[in-house]
Amino acid sequence: MTVNILGTKYTVTKKKYSEDPAFAKSGIDGYCKFQLHQIVHCDMSTYPDWEDESPESIHNTEQQTLRHEIVHAFFHESGLSYNANTVDGSWAVNEEMVDWIALQGPKVYEAWRQADAL
């Protein structure tokens, strides 16, 4: 699948945990490779210790990971990925901020939709 991020096509790939060493090496369930225009996320049903999770929990976690990585891609394509540096690092790659946008984005979108603000 591809997704358009501000005019740049990113390939979105879902991989099994065992198919991508980055999951184990970095303790992550997704990542965005800006240079390659790739977003990769883990099939959470293959993630260690997730075998007892419900299909709904797996699905919701995978959606959250995709939203998170897409936010990273938007920041990068906006020129904000590493150009907003501070002493402690760029605000645009701050995981807490990216998580907030990824978690609250659907709610913000729904509020905009209800207000006919789209």
Sequence positions of predicted segments:
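Short active-site segment of divalent metal-dependent hydrolases/proteases
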Residues: 67-75
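Short intrinsically disordered terminal tails
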Residues: 1, 114-118
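Post-HEXXH active-site segment of zinc metalloproteases
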Residues: 45-64, 76-114
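Non-catalytic architectural context of zinc metalloproteases
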Residues: 11-13, 63
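Short, low-complexity, polar/charged sequence segments that are solvent-exposed and flexible
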Residues: 31-33, 83, 117-118
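Catalytic zinc-binding patch centered on the HExxH motif and its immediate surroundings
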Residues: 1-4, 15-52
